[in-house]
Amino acid sequence: MKHFPIAVQLYTLRDQTAADYPGTLREVARMGYDGVEFAGYGGFGAGELKSLLQELGLRCAGAHEAIERLEQALDEVIAFHRELGNRYVVVPWLGEDRWGGPDGWRKVGKQLGEFGGRLR
């Protein structure tokens, strides 16, 4: 039977990662998960996280980034995720001020498309 990798979304473990980020990742690996989707980085750099994932046999399944971070520091975000080895950046939430109707959705869609083009 083919094995499909399963990752845990670290937002669901935000209390645990706030208390002990590396320890939480160790426990995730011990439980048998194949990877994690980041929702914050616990103050660790991309290289540190990549090393920890490699040590634990985990893969990066994606990561959350606020749209404001993409607007303000896209080049830094790109560099961070390249170093981490992450291929999938997710904007997890948009405030109502961002979309507020059909024109707002079109604007957000265009902006996200531009970010996606740069992140590739």
PLM feature spans:
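Active-site acidic/histidine proton-transfer and metal-coordination neighborhood
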Residues: G35, R59, I67-R120
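Glycine-rich, proline-tolerant flexible connector loops at the mouths of alpha/beta enzymes
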Residues: Y33-L56, W99
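Boundary/entry segment of secreted carbohydrate-active catalytic domains
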Residues: M1-A19, T24, D34-E37
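Distinct, well-ordered alpha-helical segments
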Residues: T17-Y21, G47-L52, L74-I78
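Active-site beta-loop-alpha junctions enriched in small/polar residues
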Residues: Q9-L13, A39-Y41, E65-E68, W93-E96
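Catalytic domains of carbohydrate-active enzymes, especially glycoside hydrolases
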Residues: P22-F44, L84-R87
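Conserved, mostly hydrophobic/aromatic
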Residues: V8, V28, V36, L53, ...
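Mobile, glycine- and charge-enriched loop segments
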Residues: M1-T12, K50, Q54-A63
